[in-house]
Amino acid sequence: MGNVASIAQITPIDQCNVKDMTMCGSDLYVATNEGYLIFDTKVGETKEMKTVGKLTSIIAKSETDLWYTVNLGRSSTINHVNGTETTTYSVANGAIKGGPYADVGAKGLAYGPDNTVWFGAYGFFHKFDGKEWTNYTCPASNFGRIYYKRFAFDSNGTVWVAGKDGQKNATFGEFDPVKGEQTPVACDFADDGVNSMFVDANDNVWIGTDYKGFYKYDGSTFVNYNKDSEANIDINIKTNATVGLCQATNGDIYYAFNKSLVCFSGDYMVVAGTVTNEDHPRDAITCLFPYGEYIFIGTSETGVHCYNTTTGEITQLADGTPVVSAISNVNTDKTKTSNAIYDLSGRQTKNLLKGQIYIQNGQKFFNK
């Protein structure tokens, strides 16, 4: 299953370049440009470190049932850890069909309906049914092949796919896996790129773009919340880049730009916190992963940080630093007995500035 790495052989969780994350129980799986780490968030300890190459995405059901993609430059491998064995799929070994470029840039691993596994690549996206891979060729754009990067699934069995073409124009569409047909959806972010996407409990598709903010699509209409909503928007949000768009259990939407984590509640859109380190001035947030009341924050130079949506605290993950006290029994009821008011750093406060976000009884409010 790859080489078991020592601490000296792979960059630790507080220093690594994070490419993707997923969660099983209290264990956080972190894909880096060297391999992957498994970090126990309750104990604050790295359980496993594997040097398996430059990862681009990872999904997992357990330590002995996980998938990851490895970037080899002009090709990629898709790898399944099953027990003590690892099976590698690629164009080179004949497992991935579609021609010599069908696994180039593989990323966006996702679990789909009926225990299927999906990933995107240059010109194709692929589905694994437990026995073999099926490749789907995307409709031709005006600029050649589409590089598919993101997948989302609704309760009706629809697969939503998004990517870019050769001129970095975005494509977003609805895919019917039964008919094997994709229907592109016209959108005003077609000259942008999609970097994140998910489906909420009401089957709305949420889409994070590189430069145009984030959208909700209800099957007929797009809403751009960076420009079309009536939310109070923090003056510190000076960009419409939305990295890692996701939803916390309380319904709030989160995304990142540069070093900042942004919270959108419907009434306000504010910077909830920042990841700063004077020794790493070029550090930036690369991805987010929501789990219970926590948002895990991956960065390019300082590893993983954890944002607590109840207290507003951000903690850098490191060996010896537990960040989650009971993640396997996450309390989704945010009601507290105390009426104290806290700012987003978790400090009790009485002095609220206009436009400041604060927490009372476990709920966030915007001070108009």
Positions of predicted regions on the chain:
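Short coil-to-beta transitions that initiate beta-strands within beta-rich domains
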Residues: 9-24, 48-63, 90-113, 137-156, ...
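Loop/turn residues immediately N-terminal
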Residues: 33-37, 72-77, 122-126, 165-171, ...
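Short loop/turn segments that connect beta-strands within beta-propeller blades
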Residues: 40-44, 81-85, 128-132, 175-180, ...
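Conserved beta-propeller blade signature
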Residues: 27-30, 66-68, 116-118, 158-161, ...
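Residue-level detector of functionally pivotal "anchor" positions at catalytic/ligand-binding pockets or at interdomain
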Residues: 310-347
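Residue-level recognition of short loop/turn positions
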Residues: 42-43, 63, 114, 156, ...
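C-terminal tail/sorting-segment detector
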Residues: 359-368
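Sec-dependent, cleavable N-terminal signal peptides
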Residues: 1-9
